[in-house]
Amino acid sequence: MRGDEVGGPIRWRMHIPVPPEELFAILNSDEGRASFWAESAIEVDSHIEFRFINGYTYRGKVLARRPPNLLSIDYLGGSVRFELHADGRGGTDLLLTHEGVTAQEWNEVHAGWLNVLFPLKAWAAHRVDLRNHDPERAWDEGYADQ
């Protein structure tokens, strides 16, 4: 987002044309997260096991959950907040904030969130999965549609 600096918090805003309750349900469910974020993202006892197409796994922890406005998780060594605000017209203004990203990884993580947010919007608004689901065409190989 404009004003973000390498090593500081990563922030992205996105408008998604569904109500906060619907968007929160996607972010907060195993099936929802698997529809746009990871091949699977199963929550057990407030821990989410993310499994990605390239074989990478990450075990995050839910830090805060206040339906339908806030979901915060430990993710990739930092904390990620999804703040959802009704736009007054049936949609949601989402603010994603990722804190704790090292300066060394900042540019890749900053860009990588777009690879999560655009598929989230496509799934929420149109039930379309933008990902290719091909392990030979993953983020590590330069593909944005992993």
Locations of the language-model features?
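Hydrophobic ligand-binding cavity/cleft-lining segments
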Residues: M1-S40, Q146
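Residue-level preference for beta-strand/loop junctions
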Residues: V6-G8, N54, L76, G90
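Well-ordered beta-strand positions in beta-sheet-rich domains
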Residues: R11-R13, T57-R59, S79-R81, H110
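Generic structural detector for well-ordered beta-strands
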Residues: R13-P17, E49-R51, K61, E83-H85
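Short, intrinsically disordered, mixed-charge
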Residues: A25-G32, P67, A111-H126
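Glycine-rich portal/gate segments that line the openings of hydrophobic small-molecule binding cavities
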Residues: N28-S79
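Beta-strand/loop substructures that line and gate deep hydrophobic ligand-binding cavities in soluble
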Residues: L70-A122
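Short, highly charged C-terminal tails/helix-capping segments
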Residues: A122-Q146
